[in-house]
Regions:
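Helix-loop-strand module that forms the ligand-binding subsite of alpha/beta enzymes
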Residues: 8-89
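Glycine-rich phosphate/pyrophosphate-binding loop and the adjoining helix
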Residues: 82-130
Length: 130
């Protein structure tokens, strides 16, 4: 597959580009580290620069968890994600929704939030709109 912008690195990212271009819905999931994405997710975001002009009409969702005690601690990661989508907006892409699992420092903490129910409802909505 030919991209308008070619990534100079020839690695497994080519397959990720292909999957992103074929998808209608793209979900980014990352724990919050120091108010923003972990390094792996930031690397993925940076690497998608190679397809920014060819990725069109996608619906983006953000799923994130963190030990932070309240939603305000997630403002930076949400703003960063919105700015990322803004860079891609030229192609009709949009940031649809986010699920923020705050106070989730332990594996079972997520079950004490409404995050699982919200994720389920979003997945149902996506399925209905396919």
């Amino acid at each position: 597959m030919l991209f308008r912008s070619q990534c100079v690195q020839k690695d497994d990212m080519q397959e990720i580009y292909k999957k992103m271009l074929e998808a209608k819905v793209i979900v980014f999931a990352s724990p919050v580290y120091f108010y923003t994405f972990n390094a792996s997710m930031k690397l993925l975001i940076d690497r998608t620069f190679a397809i920014e002009k060819t990725i069109h009409d996608k619906y983006f969702y953000l799923l994130t968890t963190g030990l932070a005690p309240e939603e305000s601690y997630f403002r930076i990661i949400k703003d960063t994600f919105q700015k990322y989508i803004d860079c891609l907006r030229v192609g009709g892409n949009r940031f649809v929704d986010s699920i923020l699992g705050f106070q989730t420092g332990n594996k079972d903490d997520i079950e004490k939030t409404d995050s699982i129910e919200k994720a389920y409802n979003i997945a149902k909505e996506i399925k209905i709109n396919e």
